[in-house]
């Protein structure tokens, strides 16, 4: 199950069902079924987490905290947490001239790809992750977005 926490306002059309579908689709496509959490919050909270876990005292658009624990009671894998700054997403959507919903979708896909083990630390990793992300966004009918450079 995809657990969703909304600590800030989201677009009305960005429903729990849609959020769960997007994240679940990433995990299914990548062959990594399991549970995860997606949290929508503000710049202040993301900045605190970014400082605490990455040593960067600034907000960012999305943070991913992979896990690979298996619940002993249910035998279901917990893939981790994706934390999204809606403030940052809103600013980026304006810059890219697309909807906040499209930006949030891109950030969910990007964050969930990290939970499946993908990264962009090397040029090869970045190329592979970008290819996967573009393919998934295309399937979701989203084509114009900026690649997140700062996370």
Go through each PLM region and give its residues.
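An acidic/histidine-cluster motif and surrounding catalytic segment
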Residues: 1-102, 116-151
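Short active-site segment of divalent metal-dependent hydrolases/proteases
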Residues: 109, 113-117
């Amino acid at each position: 199950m995809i657990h969703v926490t909304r600590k800030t306002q989201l677009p009305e059309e960005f429903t729990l069902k849609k959020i769960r579908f997007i994240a679940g689709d990433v995990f299914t496509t990548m062959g990594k079924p399991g549970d995860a959490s997606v949290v929508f919050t503000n710049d202040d909270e993301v900045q605190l987490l970014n400082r605490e876990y990455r040593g960067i005292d600034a907000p960012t658009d999305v943070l991913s905290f992979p896990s690979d624990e298996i619940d002993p009671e249910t035998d279901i894998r917990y893939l981790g947490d994706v934390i999204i700054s809606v403030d940052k997403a809103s600013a980026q959507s304006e810059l890219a001239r697309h909807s906040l919903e499209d930006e949030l979708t891109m950030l969910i896909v990007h964050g969930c790809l990290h939970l499946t083990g993908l990264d962009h630390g090397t040029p090869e990793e970045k190329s592979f992750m970008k290819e996967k992300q573009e393919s998934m966004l295309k399937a979701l009918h989203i084509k114009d977005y900026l690649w997140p450079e700062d996370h």
